């Protein structure tokens, strides 16, 4: 394919994408395929000779689309949103065309410098403390990770390296292996599974702190866990607080947990993967109160801020905590500006070496929507979630399980777990809408997350009518 054909095919692909998204609600939101459906439709080996672009495009509808879960359908209410917008798609095209691997400033100065500026832009939108911003001479700063899972792992490994060095400086006879055996990290029993995975990868004992009646980690429970482990000779060093848990969008109490972490010299990492986007709205910024106690903070613009995957924003107060843990400097990566003190080499801030020009997506989206446009988008989703909450509350057969704060509603039929499992199975089998469950205090609960960029009140109303009708069917069957 030369540039001439690329111009033609590129325009055709833009038309295909626009048609796909314009007509997405006409497709079943969940695919009607069985595991292994695709292999028989594709040859066992790659073609020896080139195939035509026309044949490939035909196979998209024939082979790929039947197995796609349409995350951007206005009838997709599962998990949490995954962001999508036309400005971000255009930026991704440009990113692919430039194709730089921005592991250092010298590898592509614009890639590095735009990321630094965009992370400062976003930090200011969130009203983060100055300590988290790079500015012109700041000690902190932001970096784009691939996911919140990566950000948590990076924070844990940095905290681990830091505490090991501190302990060995005080007691040189204390070996790394001996220290590792005693290190312990903490998070709420409502935290995302990626926190547990970070502990596994980092070789760290991770303990779940019981949450309160609102599924929030509080001071008393954390203090009790810390004191118990210190008495047993263990070394607490890392706490993950969650703002907007995956199960029910609950919030750990930063104003209680933060001071304890600071008093104990424990690294506090905040995971706000979903909820963080909402903090650009003044009315939701209170949910971030206490961030000043944190050592690192992370959320995913690729969830709810119209920046397509992947784009996970992470800030640290002390960049040397990251560079001290991940600095590898072989001669083939060195460059003449790296010791100037004026530039950032992001390879020292992350697990992999290579990195894409992801900040282009942020730049396009922030400029083409503006802060006010992004705030309006968040507010619309929150309004729709409260609309759904109101519909549920009007039906005495159902109950709301947690406070609705942002774009997630947790609800269930009054009755057994089996009844609700049956309802969810009916909902997803019908393929008109898509939901996923959670379990709260041993109760099977349905989650309704407002996700799509194009979702409107009419979609929420139709979704509720569908759920209500299926609930009637399930309840009739139970009586019979």
Curated annotation (Swiss-Prot):
Chemical reaction(s) catalysed: L-dopa + H(+) = dopamine + CO2; 5-hydroxy-L-tryptophan + H(+) = serotonin + CO2
Pfam families reported in the protein's UniProt record: Pyridoxal_deC
Encoding gene, per UniProt annotation: Ddc
Quaternary structure, from the entry: Homodimer.
Cofactors that this protein relies on: pyridoxal 5'-phosphate
GO biological process: amino acid metabolic process; carboxylic acid metabolic process; dopamine biosynthetic process; gene expression; kidney development; response to toxic substance
Gene3D superfamilies registered for this protein in UniProt: Aspartate Aminotransferase, domain 1 (3.90.1150.10), dopa decarboxylase, N-terminal domain (1.20.1340.10), Type I PLP-dependent aspartate aminotransferase-like (Major domain) (3.40.640.10)
Keyword annotations: Acetylation, Catecholamine biosynthesis, Decarboxylase, Lyase, Pyridoxal phosphate, Repeat
Residues bound to substrate: 82, 192
Gene Ontology cellular-component annotations: cytoplasm
Protein name: Aromatic-L-amino-acid decarboxylase
GO molecular function: 5-hydroxy-L-tryptophan decarboxylase activity; aromatic-L-amino-acid decarboxylase activity; enzyme binding; L-dopa decarboxylase activity; pyridoxal phosphate binding
Species per Swiss-Prot/TrEMBL record: Mus musculus
Pathway terms, separated by semicolons: Catecholamine biosynthesis; dopamine biosynthesis; dopamine from L-tyrosine: step 2/2
N6-(pyridoxal phosphate)lysine modifications at: 303
Family: Belongs to the group II decarboxylase family.
Each Sequence repeat, start to end: 58-115, 118-178
Residues binding pyridoxal 5'-phosphate: 148-149, 246, 300
Region of interest: 2 X approximate tandem repeats: 58-178
Enzyme Commission number(s) from the entry: 4.1.1.28
N-acetylmethionine: residues bearing it: 1
